[in-house]
């Protein structure tokens, strides 16, 4: 799950780099960076919501919800959140570097 999120962010960054360098890409592969970031954030939110709801179902004693599944989903949620935080940190760092460049 986290690998797919990283791949989509990497694809968006590569597309932005190609557009900045003046290279042309075909319209099917180029995507708006903001849209890709929004999709990644929505995926993180969905993962957290699913993990929370499964944990609540386990706490209420619903049938078919095992502790193993709950723990795995909570860890997936945690890893995806950490990935999102690291991507944000890299974006802030890159923005800071660009703003500190002399023209």
From Swiss-Prot:
<dbReference type="Pfam" id="PF02049">
    <property type="entry name" value="FliE"/>
</dbReference>
<protein>
    <recommendedName>
        <fullName>Flagellar hook-basal body complex protein FliE</fullName>
    </recommendedName>
</protein>
<dbReference type="InterPro" id="IPR001624">
    <property type="entry name" value="FliE"/>
</dbReference>
<comment type="similarity">
    <text>Belongs to the FliE family.</text>
</comment>
<dbReference type="GO" id="GO:0009425">
    <property type="term" value="C:bacterial-type flagellum basal body"/>
</dbReference>
<dbReference type="GO" id="GO:0071973">
    <property type="term" value="P:bacterial-type flagellum-dependent cell motility"/>
</dbReference>
<dbReference type="GO" id="GO:0005198">
    <property type="term" value="F:structural molecule activity"/>
</dbReference>
<keyword id="KW-0975">Bacterial flagellum</keyword>
<dbReference type="GO" id="GO:0003774">
    <property type="term" value="F:cytoskeletal motor activity"/>
</dbReference>
């Amino acid at each position: 799950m986290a690998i797919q999120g990283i791949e989509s962010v990497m694809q968006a960054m590569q597309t932005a780099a190609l557009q900045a360098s003046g290279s042309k890409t075909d319209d099917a592969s180029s995507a708006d960076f903001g849209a890709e970031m929004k999709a990644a954030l929505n995926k993180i939110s969905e993962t957290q919501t699913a993990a929370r709801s499964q944990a609540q179902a386990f706490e209420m004693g619903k049938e078919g919800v095992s502790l193993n599944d709950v723990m795995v989903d909570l860890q997936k949620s945690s890893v995806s959140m950490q990935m999102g935080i690291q991507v944000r940190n890299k974006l802030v760092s890159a923005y800071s570097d660009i703003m500190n460049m002399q023209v």
